């Protein structure tokens, strides 16, 4: 049995419950969300000036 410590990813969620799916598009379904395997890349999207007014948060997702 192999233990994989990287069995999670990060998704970007706004204050209204929508997930970032790429190219400035948002959707309610987590399965469509763009997933990031590094918190560094997720933070880059979160801090993007285009999305300041959306009140973004980073969500840790089990995969």
State where each predicted segment sits.
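Short, Lys/Arg-enriched, disordered terminal segments
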Residues: 1-6, 62-63
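Cysteine-patterned extracellular/luminal domains and small secreted cysteine-rich peptides
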Residues: 3-4, 21, 49-52
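Short aromatic-glycine-(Arg/Gly/Cys) micro-motifs in beta-strand/loop hairpins
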Residues: 5-32
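C-terminal catalytic core of Y-nucleophile DNA break-rejoin enzymes
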Residues: 36
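Short, mixed-charge low-complexity intrinsically disordered segments
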Residues: 39-63
């Amino acid at each position: 049995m192999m233990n994989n410590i990287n069995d999670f990813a990060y998704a970007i969620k706004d204050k209204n419950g929508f997930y970032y799916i790429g190219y400035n598009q948002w959707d309610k379904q987590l399965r469509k969300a763009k997933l990031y395997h590094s918190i560094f890349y997720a933070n880059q999207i979160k801090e993007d000036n285009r999305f300041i007014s959306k009140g973004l948060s980073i969500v840790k997702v089990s995969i």
